[in-house]
């Protein structure tokens, strides 16, 4: 009886998700196949784009593999460390390290033809962004954390890997430039949480969030939508 009482979520959290009895119950009807498939596509795509960034900086093959692994798995790892969610994903699934490292080596071998696949990688990157975001939100939800933390968890999972890549490659992170990237992650997470709070099942909420976020990202790329830019020049000298 005591163990059952300890497993029961605090009463105050029930008001956050009125359509569900517990945080874990939100996902019992959701087949993991869709998100898992998108996750695998995303880490491979992120690893390949990271390998190209490393190649532009004339890194050796070891550097290319490290940059690829950090980019593909760094967002989720940073999220788990900040939230105290252990073990880390790549510790449980070390095959992900081999996948990302292999993708990086393959990219180095076929680099001359990569330009022809630019649109494919943009689509895969957009899919990865929204899939990582939803996965990050779900991890925080399973830990029964506040909504704000859930949103931030989704953004960290979706965006932090790219920030680490750009920092290691000595570039201004894409997250801090004019492109709609972090904002797409935020909207995706908000739509997912909003759908769940309205009583939709995870089977409905996940596709809604993924479709809306993917559409927003692709439209931003197609029509060059940008965030307002702050420009400051010190003219006192």
Regions found by a protein language model. Name each.
Residues 26-34, 81-91, 136-149, 194-205:
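Helix-coil boundary and interhelical linker segments in multi-pass alpha-helical membrane proteins
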Residues 31-43, 88-102, 146-158:
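Structural signature of hydrophobic alpha-helical transmembrane segments
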Residues 36-49, 67-70:
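The first (N-terminal) embedded transmembrane alpha-helix
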Residues 47-57, 80, 105-118, 163-174, ...:
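C-terminal ends of transmembrane helices
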Residues 62-70, 93-97, 118-129, 153, ...:
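Cytoplasmic-side transmembrane-helix entry/capping segments in multi-pass membrane proteins
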Residues 67-75, 95, 99-103, 107, ...:
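Alpha-helical transmembrane segments in multi-pass membrane proteins
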Residues 102-139:
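Ordered, amphipathic secondary-structure segments that act as subunit-interaction surfaces
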Residues 230-237:
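Short, highly charged, low-complexity non-transmembrane loops/tails of multi-pass membrane proteins
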């Amino acid at each position: 009886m005591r163990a059952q009482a300890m497993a029961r979520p605090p009463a105050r959290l029930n008001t956050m998700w009125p359509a569900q009895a517990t945080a874990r119950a939100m996902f019992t009807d959701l087949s993991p196949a869709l998100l898992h498939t998108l996750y695998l596509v995303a880490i491979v795509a992120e690893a390949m784009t990271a390998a190209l960034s490393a190649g532009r900086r004339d890194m050796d093959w070891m550097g290319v593999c490290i940059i690829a692994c950090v980019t593909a798995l760094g967002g989720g790892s940073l999220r788990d460390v900040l939230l105290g969610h252990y073990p880390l994903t790549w510790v449980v699934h070390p095959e992900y390290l081999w996948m990302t490292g292999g993708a990086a080596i393959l990219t180095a071998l076929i680099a001359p033809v990569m330009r022809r696949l630019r649109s494919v990688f943009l689509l895969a990157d957009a899919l990865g962004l929204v899939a990582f975001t939803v996965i990050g939100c779900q991890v925080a939800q399973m830990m029964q954390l506040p909504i704000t933390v859930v949103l931030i968890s989704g953004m960290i999972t979706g965006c932090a890997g790219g920030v680490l890549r750009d920092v290691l490659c000595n570039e201004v992170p894409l997250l801090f430039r004019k492109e709609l990237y972090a904002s797409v992650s935020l909207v995706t997470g908000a739509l997912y949480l909003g759908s769940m709070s309205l009583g939709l099942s995870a089977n409905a909420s996940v596709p809604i969030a993924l479709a809306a976020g993917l559409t927003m990202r692709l439209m931003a790329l197609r029509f060059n939508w940008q965030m307002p830019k702050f420009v400051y020049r010190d003219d006192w000298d």
